[in-house]
């Protein structure tokens, strides 16, 4: 893949959709992969991008994001309204490590429904392709497409310290590694997986059928096809 630092002129020749509700955080310095590896749900030691979460010690989602590599740096593709809070949270764990954590205003997240540019979204190929490049294009259609596939993200949809990571279908969307070792919130998340006990999950409901009450078995819930295949 092109280095993000060298991609600007190349990406300007592509038809792009910029996700203006996303921001890019750059982490640079000594062993940034090792630093992030000990915090987030997914394995950032191998091929990137991956989808991951930063959880409470009880295993509830605080932030969700995609992690990309840019040379020795890591880039976090996150919800724009939560970017500053995520920078502060990551900085709490930095201690005396020589690592810089900051929003990179020169970069933006781009998306294409039909592919061609970038890489497939690691959560679900049907979400289309995305990449990080210069911030210069308007956004179109991404949120509607994502929600039609039953993929939630951000505090407006997942809440903050409200949803357990596996309730957000992280195990079905590649958002957690059960082999990487410790991270914040790992104990409860691993226990739920080991017991095969996820009491609640996010589903797609038909238009106009949303009710503000709890139900045990939403019989007319539309289970996304990717979840049907995974559970079969």
Q: Could you tell me what each predicted segment is?
A:
Residues 166-176, 190-232:
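Glycine-rich, small/acidic residue-mixed loop/short-helix segments
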Residues 139-194, 199:
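A mid-sequence, solvent-exposed acidic-amphipathic segment
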Residues 15-26, 63-152:
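Acidic, low-complexity central loop/insert segments
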Residues 31-36, 83-87, 135-138, 212, ...:
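Short, conserved charged micro-motifs
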Residues 4, 11-12, 143-153, 222-231:
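A structural boundary/capping signal
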Residues 4-62:
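Acidic, proline/glycine-enriched N-terminal capping motif
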Residues 29, 76, 185:
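Residue-level signal for inorganic ion chemistry
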């Amino acid at each position: 893949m092109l280095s993000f630092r060298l991609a600007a002129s190349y990406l300007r020749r592509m038809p792009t959709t910029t996700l203006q509700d996303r921001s890019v955080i750059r982490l640079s310095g000594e062993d940034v992969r090792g630093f992030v590896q000990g915090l987030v749900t997914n394995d950032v030691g191998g091929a990137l991008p991956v989808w991951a979460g930063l959880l409470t010690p009880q295993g509830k989602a605080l932030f969700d994001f995609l992690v990309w590599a840019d040379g020795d740096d890591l880039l976090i593709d996150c919800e724009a309204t939560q970017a500053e809070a995520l920078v502060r949270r990551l900085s709490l764990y930095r201690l005396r490590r020589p690592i810089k954590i900051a929003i990179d205003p020169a970069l933006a997240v781009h998306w294409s429904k039909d592919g061609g540019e970038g890489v497939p979204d690691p959560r679900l190929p049907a979400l289309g392709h995305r990449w990080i490049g210069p911030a210069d294009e308007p956004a179109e259609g991404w949120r509607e497409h994502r929600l039609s596939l039953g993929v939630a993200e951000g505090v407006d949809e997942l809440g903050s310290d409200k949803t357990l990571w596996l309730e957000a279908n992280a195990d079905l969307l590649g958002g957690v590694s059960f082999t990487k070792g410790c991270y914040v919130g790992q104990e409860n998340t691993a226990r739920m997986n080991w017991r095969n006990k996820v009491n609640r999950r996010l589903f797609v409901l038909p238009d106009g059928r949303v009710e503000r009450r709890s139900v045990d078995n939403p019989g007319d819930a539309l289970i996304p096809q990717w979840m049907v295949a995974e559970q079969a």
